[in-house]
Amino acid sequence: MPLIDVNGTQINYLDEGPRDAPAIIFSNSMFFDVTMFEKQAAAFADKYRVVRYDHRGQGGSAKEPRNKLDMDTLTDDTAALIEALDLKKCCFVGNSMGGFIGLRLAARRPDLIASAVIMGSSADAEVSVEAMDAVTEAIEQNGVAPVVEDV
């Protein structure tokens, strides 16, 4: 998978479908990677340009210290990715953490997105990285594959 330099980090991404088609960008949940939306990408890639990416610190993207894993930075990464790939007015689809990013993009950068699908998320303040330590440990031991099948 290709890496792209955006916002001071390297982001791993997949870019599928016709390049001149309307674009959909999928933003996964915390602890997941591009495979989370694999089935959805397969369903849309014949008629849409479909971009899936790993957030900084996740999957194949550059590992980062905790102080660079806040939602504002992740939102800036996503905006920079949309601009770098020239997705124009894309449809943004975000689940959980991806939903937090989508809400911020819609409010702060409406020039980048035409529509947003926000799932399993809210406009509440996000949980701190430290509060997720137990979940992080469980996923490191068992992986995310069993959970992805249910999403």
Give the positions of each predicted feature:
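Short acidic-hydrophobic surface loop/beta-edge motif
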Residues: P2-V6
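Conserved HGGG/HGGXW glycine-rich cap/lid loop of the alpha/beta-hydrolase fold
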Residues: N7-N67, L81
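Conserved alpha/beta-hydrolase "nucleophile elbow" surrounding the catalytic nucleophile
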Residues: N28-M30, C90, G94-G99
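Residue in the alpha/beta-hydrolase core beta-strand immediately N-terminal to the catalytic nucleophile
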Residues: D54, C91, A114-V117
